[in-house]
Structures are given as structure tokens and as C-alpha cells.
Amino acid sequence: MSDQEIKSLVYNSEEIISSNVVEYTNRIIEAGITFDQELFTEYVQKALAEFGLLEVYNTIILPTLERIGILWLTNNIMPSQEHFISELVKQTIISNISFDNKIPDSAPSWLVFLPENEHHEIALLLAKYILKENNQKVIYLGQSVPKESLEIVRHHKKIDNILFS
């Protein structure tokens, strides 16, 4: 794919939310297509400073992932490009999850995981972020968790809620 074709695919947006949001989305897609982690980081950090993680997720990340998905389904990008951008999104969410906030002992606990053979954990990571920001205890098991292993967790920890996707 030529540079002009890439730019045409990236900048062809029918959604006009705000010029900044469109710019962030376009640049993040460009970063994914060209494997440019520095460009991704630059624009995501600007967006986070302007909007915060939840707003960035809703107004920039989701439309970006939708457009990346369309590009992938129409064979305009390779799986490696889609995986690259998805991994950077996951890293962004993880880096915003606080690991040092003191959660009260009385706080409800959540067991958070994806069932076996499910690997798309971006939304689950965001759920973890939201729960932690709301002072909830989270036991995050991640992706593709075998059903049998859940009993082990319940044996060792009191679980008030279960969240899976």
C-alpha cells in the first residue's frame, strides 16, 4: 500500500466530533498502520491530558478500533497492524490503572476475566480501571481463563461479584 493510499484510508472519516478528536483518531490510526509507537504515544498522551482516560476511550479509542476493524475486514491492513494498535491501547489502559491506591477492606471484591478462548481484553481492562477508580477490589485474571481454575480463586478469596466478557 502506498503512502497516499494509507493517508486516504486513515483520513477518510465520516464522523466529525471535534477537530481535535478527529486529529487524534487519524494520527493514532496512522501510527498503527506505520508501526510508529512514538506517534501513537504523542497523540494518546495529548488526548489523555485534554480529556482523561474514559473520554479518550469513548470518543477516540472506540472509533479508532472500529475503523481499524473495518480496514482489517476490507483487507486494507494486515493483522500485524491491528495487533500493534490493540497492544498499544491495552498498554495505555494498563498504565493508567492505579496500583497504589489503598482500597478499604470493606470494599466489594470483583473477579474479572475472559472465558477460555476469548482474547479481546481491551474492554475488560477498562472495566478494571473503572472498578479500581471506584475503590473496588479487583482480582484480574485476564484472557482465556479455563472454567476449572475459577474455583481455585473462590477457594482462596471471597468474591462478591464476577465480571466476564
Where are these regions (language model features)?
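C-terminal regulatory/effector modules of DNA-binding transcriptional regulators
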Residues: 72-165
